[in-house]
Regions:
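Beta-propeller blade termini and top-face loops
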Residues: 4-435
Length: 435
């Protein structure tokens, strides 16, 4: 940071920030994990930091605001010591608006204090796994905008207190997904993904992409391919899910010439294509799917909508359509002790179902709105304008004359969809230009 910027920041040191809204919507949820022993939830967002609830979603507290980054890619609670929480920063879905991170963080007191544990140049950490000794595996995607060597799978040895890169392909290939066998913490699957975001297009896939498996905690890896039943040719992004009730059943959503769902019934040794119907909605962006903790054939697939299969992925029906809750879904926590309870995160915030997905409740008090740009006009009192990711463009007052303070009713939605820039006309109060 330049000396000039630092000097300017000193002028604002004594100012207190205040929220002016709007509170009519939430924003993009990217990660969910739960300390079930104490009923503590952690929810990460694309640019709104990490939030904690000790009341199963009734009340929320921001616990990451003092850190150098607010984009969350992964959150993992230790099963051995539930007060230990790891957070990977950087959003793991690199569209045009992808937000980079600054490494991986650890809290040893349930989010009260944090320490950066390294991997600052990985840009995006989308998955974290922990073994039975609290050693950590981190899936680093790397920079979305060009080659960099800080990609792949990293292993943190708690006893030694240091990181080791245990899976690396090349400077353009990162790890987009990482799952651990629930019955064998030495067995992991890593989805390596070659990709690059450019201002004018996006390259997804290449010779670096592929599905890798280890059975010795990452000391050695085997790349799975056509011989094992996976598609030939260059692959794109791969999403992986292991059935908790039967870890020999493994699913993979594979972006390729024909994007399809694949299944292994022998722990990943051999694979067969299940279907290419009802899957593959923008696979570079949507690769999240989950298996019912109690039923190996019951799957939920997150994409523009939420789809459900009860026959091992052969057929899909709509669980959540475009209406009812916000579309574009990215995160899910399926209660392992009560599969009827499902928490789901999307571009509009957090939702919960307590009847297996038949009915859903929106969690209204998570202020995660992701503003791309803000502006203001010259009225008195002046108004603030902002374009929200997938939640419209809004106009609201900086302050009001009535005693109730700024209310949701004081805000006006100017346009729907993805909001970006709003430029008020300085000479005409009623004119605003939108991008």
């Amino acid at each position: 940071m330049s000396a000039l910027v630092q000097a300017q920041l000193k002028n604002f040191k004594g100012m207190q920030m205040r929220s002016i809204g709007p509170a009519v919507t939430s924003g993009r949820v990217t990660a969910i994990d739960v300390n079930q022993q104490q009923g503590i939830m952690y929810v990460g967002s694309a640019s709104g930091g990490l939030w904690k609830s000790e009341s199963w979603g009734t009340h929320w507290t921001p616990i990451f605001d003092e850190q150098v980054v607010s984009s969350i890619g992964a959150v993992k609670v230790s099963k051995l010591h539930p007060d230990i929480v790891w957070v990977g920063t950087g959003e793991g879905n690199p569209r045009n608006s992808q937000t980079s991170g600054r490494g991986i963080f650890q809290s040893r007191d349930a989010g009260k204090t944090w320490k950066c544990m390294g991997l600052e140049e990985t840009k995006t950490i989308h998955r974290i796994c922990m073994d039975g000794h609290d050693n950590v595996y981190a899936a680093a995607m790397g920079s979305a905008w060009g080659p960099n060597p800080d990609r792949g799978v990293f292993y943190y040895n708690v006893a030694l207190g240091q990181w080791k890169k245990i899976l690396f392909v090349n400077d353009s290939t990162g790890c987009a997904d990482l799952v651990m066998d629930p019955l064998n913490d030495q067995k992991l699957f890593a989805a390596m993904w070659q990709y690059e975001r450019k201002p004018w297009n996006f390259n997804s896939g290449g010779k670096g992409s592929g599905l890798h498996m280890t059975v010795d905690g990452g000391t050695t890896w085997k790349r799975l391919g056509e011989k094992e039943g996976l598609p030939k040719g260059h692959l794109g992004r791969v999403g992986i899910a292991i059935a908790p009730s039967n870890s020999r059943v493994v699913y993979a959503m594979i972006e390729s010439k024909v994007t399809a769902l694949y299944k292994s019934e022998d722990g990943g040794a051999n694979w067969k294509m299940v279907t290419d119907k009802g899957v593959g909605d923008r696979p570079f962006y949507y690769s999240e799917f989950y298996v019912d903790p109690a039923n190996e054939n019951h799957l939920i697939y997150l994409h523009s909508i939420v789809s459900e299969s009860i026959d091992g992925g052969k057929n899909w029906t709509t669980m959540l359509p475009y209406y009812g809750v916000h579309p574009d879904h990215h995160a899910l926590w399926w209660n392992p002790t009560n599969p009827m309870e499902i928490w789901e995160g999307n571009d509009g915030g957090l939702n919960v179902s307590r009847d297996g997905g038949k009915n859903w409740e929106f969690i209204p008090n998570l202020p995660l709105g992701q503003f791309y740009h803000i502006n203001y006009d010259l009225q008195v009192p002046y108004h603030v304008y902002g374009g929200l990711q997938d939640n419209g463009t809004w106009k609201g007052p900086a302050y009001v004359w009535h005693s109730d303070g700024i209310l949701d009713s004081d805000w006006q939605e100017l346009y729907f969809g993805d909001g970006f820039d709003a430029i008020p006309d300085a000479s005409e109060d009623n004119w605003v230009y939108l991008l």
